[in-house]
A protein has these predicted regions:
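Mobile "lid/hinge" segments at catalytic clefts and subdomain interfaces of large enzymes
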Residues: 1-38, 111, 119
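Glycine-/charge-enriched secondary-structure boundary and capping motifs
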Residues: 31-35, 44-47, 53-177
């Protein structure tokens, strides 16, 4: 869950213009596209960066990019903080994924992480040490909204939609809504 209004959000991991194997691809007919390539050496460096960042108090939180891509990962980060009124503002994908189409940027399931950072200068220095190029994509806000480029959604409404299929299976889900 998001921790602090005003903290920076960074992307680790390259976005690809491929939707192969993704949830979105199943709906738009692209499920037979190739899967995005995985650079295991880069992933190893990213995880080492996250571990040291957590140990030094620089990283406030992180979320993997997987099912549903970056857009879903960002939404999931807001769910635990929605009652505190926290939200996010993420820049247009044309800024942080210049050579990738918007579908691949937001919904491609190439690995990576969204990272909430307390101190950007220390984070960027630590990233250089680990030979990782994080990209600042946005900020944590007190708007209670998830703003993805030009699209804006109420975080509580997103949680209700996301958690609806779970109601009745998990008591905590009913209490949260």
């Amino acid at each position: 869950a998001l921790k602090t209004k005003g903290s920076a959000l960074y992307l680790l991991g390259v976005r690809h213009d491929a939707l192969g194997g993704s949830i979105v691809a199943r709906f738009v007919g692209g499920d037979l596209e190739p899967l995005p390539a995985i650079d295991l050496t880069a992933v190893h460096r990213e995880i080492a960066l996250l571990r040291e960042g957590y140990a030094n108090g620089i990283v406030l939180g992180a979320h993997d990019i997987s099912d549903g891509g970056l857009a879903v990962s960002i939404c999931e980060m807001t769910f635990g903080a929605r009652r505190r009124g926290l939200g996010v503002r993420i820049d247009s994908c044309e800024r942080w994924a210049k050579d990738v189409g918007s579908a691949g940027a937001w919904f491609g399931e190439a690995g990576g992480f969204v990272v909430e950072i307390a101190a950007t200068t220390a984070w960027e220095a630590l990233a250089r040490k680990h030979d990782v190029q994080p990209i600042r994509i946005g900020d944590v806000t007190d708007s209670g909204r998830v703003v993805l480029g030009e699209s804006s959604f109420d975080a509580a409404t997103l949680f209700d939609v996301w958690s609806a299929p779970l109601r009745g299976f998990y008591d905590a889900t009913e209490e949260e809504s």
